[in-house]
Amino acid sequence: MEEVWELWTTKGGLEMWWGPEGFTTAVSKLDLRPGGEFEYAMTATSPDAVEAMKSAGLSLTSVARGRYAEITPRRRLAYVTVADFIPGVAPYEVAAVVEIHPASGGVRMVVTEDAMHDDLWTQRSMMGMNSSLDRLTKVLDARHGQRRAPR
């Protein structure tokens, strides 16, 4: 659980996997405490990601800002991000909770996110999170030289 916690809560950990496939992330601020702020830039780098961003009318790089709401080391991380990158939509907050549980032979993560302003953006958010979690699994697999069961 310590390793998964580190990947969720450190600059180096997040930069290894955060963001959908085809994106890189650069963390510029990470104050891991309740009320602490974080900020990162996520950039589309693969041809497919670049095309998807352009077709959605979005910048290739978006800066995300948020704050930590709750921190229970190695168990629970709650945070709020500001969705301020959507053309024609006023900024609003989106809450998320990550729960980390011991499981037979490993760790079980439960990630819960608020819905976004409409079904399309909620679906995009879910797809992005699922892709990010796939990348997290690959990081863990590479570290342990094994393949894990699908989520």
Q: Model segments located where?
A:
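A short, structured loop/turn motif at beta-sheet edges
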Residues: 1-2, 30-35, 69-76, 99-108, ...
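Hydrophobic ligand-binding cavity/cleft-lining segments
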Residues: 1-25, 29
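Hydrophobic pocket/interface hotspot
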Residues: 4, 14, 38-40, 68, ...
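Surface loops and adjacent helix of pleckstrin homology
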Residues: 19, 43, 82, 112, ...
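Short solvent-exposed loop/turn micro-motifs enriched in small/polar/acidic residues
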Residues: 22-24, 61, 91-93
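Glycine-rich portal/gate segments that line the openings of hydrophobic small-molecule binding cavities
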Residues: 26-82
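Beta-strand/loop substructures that line and gate deep hydrophobic ligand-binding cavities in soluble
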Residues: 69-70, 78-130
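Short, highly charged C-terminal tails/helix-capping segments
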Residues: 138-151
